[in-house]
From Swiss-Prot:
This is Sigma-C capsid protein. Residues 60-80 form a coiled coil. The C-terminus is important for the induction of cellular apoptosis. Belongs to the orthoreovirus sigma C protein family. Signal peptide: none annotated. The lineage of its organism: Viruses, Riboviria, Orthornavirae, Duplornaviricota, Resentoviricetes. It comes from Avian reovirus (strain S1133). GO terms for biological process: symbiont entry into host cell; virion attachment to host cell. Keywords: Apoptosis, Capsid protein, Coiled coil, Host-virus interaction, Viral attachment to host cell, Virion, Virus entry into host cell.
């Protein structure tokens, strides 16, 4: 009955009544049934309407669900786009994180460099302050010197006197220099006079062990304030004891050299004895000794040396090597 429309339901009811018309049923017995059927029809009608409303509602819901499906599809597409964007952002954030880490490391290195530079700047500041102080002090000293120079320049006479070897002429102070001692240079280094090699003959006289004389050929090498003697004999010297004194006097030079002054020792050199190397031949035996000489005056010196034996003998090939400061 639920699936029948009202007209169909009436026909069903009429059929039931016709089938039961031969049954002995009173009108009063059918009344409740009729009422119940009427109520049932009303309920069925109401149910049909409710089902119709529900169907409409379901149709609306279906339409809404379809709209929601489309909306969800759009949302899904948007979410996919957002997912792609978020992935790209994550990659960018990862790259940025790496860059930030690198920048942090560089910043730390730069901070260390800046700290070192700051320390250097602080040290330079101290040095500059000290330099400023020194410059200020030097400026005062220079100003004082300028004032003193101006005062000296404005004075007609400097009022100073100089002792040798300093001398003054026309306001210029000079140093009297010996060219054999130093050169006229800024540092006064070495001597400026040229070296000389003077060759001459010198007659030496034997005393205290010999009364003989011997002729010596002399090479005198003069350099600066030094003269080195290299002498050799041209004859024999007769000796009578085991020690002989041989005297050299500038007056006994037979061929005067070009610069006799370079054979005169300085006063300081004359104050002490000086070493002399002597060698000679006696009786075919060669003897060599280191003897000493002494000046008795600025022009005379005597050397004392062993003769290599006792008694009278002739010594030959006598050589004498020594040097003096002039």
């Amino acid at each position: 009955m639920a699936g029948l429309n009202p007209s169909q339901r009436r026909e069903v009811v009429s059929l039931i009544l016709s089938l039961t018309s031969n049954v002995n049923i009173s009108h009063g017995d059918l009344t409740p049934i009729y009422e119940r059927l009427t109520n049932l029809e009303a309920s069925t009608e109401l149910l049909h309407r409710s089902i119709s409303d529900i169907s409409t509602t379901v149709s609306n819901i279906s339409a809404n669900l379809q709209d929601m499906t489309h909306t969800l599809d759009d949302v899904t597409a948007n979410l996919d786009g957002l997912r792609t964007t978020v992935t790209a952002l994550q990659d960018s954030v990862s790259i940025l994180s790496t860059n930030v880490t690198d920048l942090t490391n560089r910043s730390s290195a730069h901070a260390a460099i800046l700290s070192s530079l700051q320390t250097t700047v602080d040290g330079n500041s101290t040095a500059i302050s000290n330099l400023k102080s020194d410059i200020s002090s030097n400026g005062l000293a220079i100003t004082d010197l300028q004032d003193r120079v101006k005062s000296l320049e404005s004075t007609a006479s400097h009022g100073l006197s100089f002792s040798p070897p300093l001398s003054v002429a026309d306001g210029v102070v000079s140093l009297d220099m010996d060219p054999y001692f130093c050169s006229q240079r800024v540092s006064l280094t070495s001597y400026s006079a040229e070296a000389q090699l003077m060759q001459f003959r010198w007659m030496a006289r034997g005393t205290n062990g010999s009364s003989d004389t011997i002729d010596m050929t002399v090479n005198a090498h003069c350099h600066g304030r030094r003269t080195d003697y290299m002498m050799s004999s041209t004859g024999n010297l007769t000796v009578t004891s085991n020690v002989v004194l041989l005297t050299f006097d500038l007056s006994d030079i037979t061929h005067i050299p070009s610069d006799l002054a370079r054979l005169v020792p300085s006063a300081g050199f004359q104050a002490a004895s000086f070493p002399v190397d002597v060698s000679f031949t006696r009786d075919s035996a060669t003897h060599a000794y280191q003897a000493y000489g002494v000046y008795s005056s600025s022009r005379v010196f005597t050397i004392t040396f062993p003769t290599g034996g006792d008694g009278t003998a002739n010594i030959r090939s006598l050589t004498v090597r020594t040097g003096i400061d002039t």
